[in-house]
């Protein structure tokens, strides 16, 4: 059975939207294995929240493709997360991108696929993803 949680019925639309790069953000759930489905990762972490969180992707991209991949991510509403230290490993630069959004298994799957597609076309790889929220944010269900 599918249940829908409507944001205007539980007050989560009033939840303050977290800002990518905010140093007060704390990790809720993360993943580095592309084979683990989003629904499994969220279920194992017990994540069921209707409030916006920050979804951060850590991408490894060839330096020559960094500008093109950054532009592609920005066109999908992401920002470059400058709170993460970047480095270059095996010729691949770390590109941390983040976006504040309401996340469920479908949304997370869609965004993970979008990022995987963007970096694979550029000859890079996804290093991982993480959901972040301010430590003092109440959980809404």
Predicted regions and their residues:
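Long, contiguous binding/interaction regions
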Residues: 1-141
């Amino acid at each position: 059975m599918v249940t829908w949680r409507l944001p205007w019925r539980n007050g989560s639309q009033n939840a303050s939207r977290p800002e990518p790069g905010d140093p007060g953000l704390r990790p809720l759930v993360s993943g580095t294995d592309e084979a683990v489905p989003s629904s499994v990762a969220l279920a194992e972490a017990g994540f069921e929240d209707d409030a916006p969180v920050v979804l951060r992707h850590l991408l490894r991209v060839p330096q020559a493709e960094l500008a093109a991949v950054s532009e592609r991510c920005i066109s999908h509403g992401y920002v470059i997360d400058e709170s993460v230290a970047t480095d270059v490993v095996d010729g691949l630069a770390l590109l941390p991108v983040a976006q504040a959004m309401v996340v469920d298994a479908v949304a997370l799957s869609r965004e993970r696929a979008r990022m995987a597609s963007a970096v694979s076309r550029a000859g890079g790889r996804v290093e991982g993803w993480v959901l972040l929220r301010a430590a003092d944010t109440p959980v809404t269900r």
